[in-house]
């Protein structure tokens, strides 16, 4: 099974006050499909536990033509396109009920050993010869710099509800923090055209708080989410808004 598709109907809790799907829940869906597909391909959570390793999401680049709305029926498709060294590339497409592409994106995952927390060569741990790779959309995954100067910052509490099965703050929470900062600054509805994410280190509940630093220039929004004293970057995120 080189591709996995799953149908969704957008629920009320997945939408913002304007009836559009929250970015956080879009990334929730991506995470769930990635996990489910990895299980089916024999490289998922349970197999990783047996080999004392884990997949860690490192990057996303998502291009949004249109966000689904409340009660919309969509299909999300995911597939692997490449394994290189310790990394695997996984891509996503979101279709509307008529088969039109609403959203497309690419993600990079790193296989790490749980004992030393160091990257592992994927081909040395798993037999990937039977995994059929699909052609890549060639969406770039660029390295992102930290926000050094910023025009907005806010301290946010971490909650027990933010923690996932891996015992750290779920990746989608960082997206939600950026959505909050966007609305705090714009005070109105906004449309996102593109999101790039560079996860640097996993926050845990004992961190208690994170600092969200934002730089807004026209339709370009840069975020760095750090430890409360700015000593550690947890995530760097760029969001581009539509005109």
What residues fall within each predicted segment?
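HotDog/MaoC-like acyl-thioester-processing domains
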Residues: 1-5, 61-146, 203-206, 215-243
């Amino acid at each position: 099974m080189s591709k996995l598709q799953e149908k969704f109907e957008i629920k009320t809790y997945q939408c913002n006050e304007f009836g559009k799907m929250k970015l956080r829940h879009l990334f929730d869906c991506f995470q769930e499909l990635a996990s489910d597909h990895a299980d089916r391909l024999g490289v998922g959570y349970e197999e990783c536990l047996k080999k004392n390793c884990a997949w860690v999401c490192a990057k996303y680049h998502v291009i949004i033509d249109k966000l689904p709305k409340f009660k919309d029926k969509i299909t999300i498709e995911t597939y692997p396109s490449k394994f290189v060294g310790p990394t695997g590339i996984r891509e996503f497409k979101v279709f509307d009920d008529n088969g039109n592409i609403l959203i497309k994106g690419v993600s990079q995952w790193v296989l790490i050993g749980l004992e030393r927390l160091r990257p592992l060569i994927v081909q040395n741990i798993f037999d990937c010869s039977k995994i059929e790779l699909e052609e890549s959309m060639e969406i770039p995954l660029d390295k992102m710099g930290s926000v050094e100067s910023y025009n907005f910052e806010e301290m946010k509490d971490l909650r027990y509800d933010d923690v996932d099965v891996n015992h750290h703050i779920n990746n989608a929470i960082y997206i939600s923090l950026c959505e909050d900062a966007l609305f705090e600054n714009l005070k109105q509805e906004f449309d996102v055209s593109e999101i790039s994410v560079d996860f640097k280190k996993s926050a845990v509940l004992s961190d208690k708080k994170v600092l969200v630093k934002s730089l807004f220039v026209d339709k370009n929004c840069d975020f760095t989410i750090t430890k409360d004293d700015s000593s550690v970057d947890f995530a760097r995120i760029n969001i581009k808004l539509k005109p």
